[in-house]
Amino acid sequence: VSSPASAAVSSPGVAPGRQAAQALAALLAQSGTDRAAITQAFNAVAGCSTGLSQDQAIFSNAASSRQTLLGELAALPDRSALPASMLQDLTAAWQASGQADQDFAKWTQDEISQGCSTNDQSDASYQAATAPDDQATKDKKAFAALWAAIADEYGLPLYQYNQI
């Protein structure tokens, strides 16, 4: 099974920077799909919607997906052709997001088992998620600022921090 990143490997005549950027764009697209589901799950749990077990699964699956993305990012073809600081920002962002996703899954379980309270920010698992979530946002903003120039150079999609 090939990943989106490996699908861009070694096209003859394609500059390494373009190849790496295309592979990274594929990972960002994959991450964006997860991000939309996470946002919906967060809003559902905060509002005590029905289906909290499904929302918990979304958070757990997202944490797992972030680990997969991190592995693919580490194996990105021609990654040395991209700015190291940009890759470090994205790595840190996905690591922090993965931790936040795990904590949000625990928060959801707490809401299920203890009775859901709308916008319950006093839960220990919710509070544990805020620091890595804040760090992820900071790192995503730094990444997105650097990605914009790469995307522009190679005609690739732009990503705002809240789409990563």
What are these regions (language model features)?
Residues A8-G17:
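Eukaryotic intrinsically disordered, low-complexity linkers and tails enriched in Pro/Ser/Thr/Gln/Gly
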Residues Q19-T108, T118-I164:
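Alpha-helical segments in soluble extracytoplasmic regions
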Residues I112-G115:
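A glycine-biased, small/acidic residue-tolerant capping/turn segment at secondary-structure junctions
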Residues V1-V9:
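Hydrophobic single-pass membrane-targeting/anchoring helices
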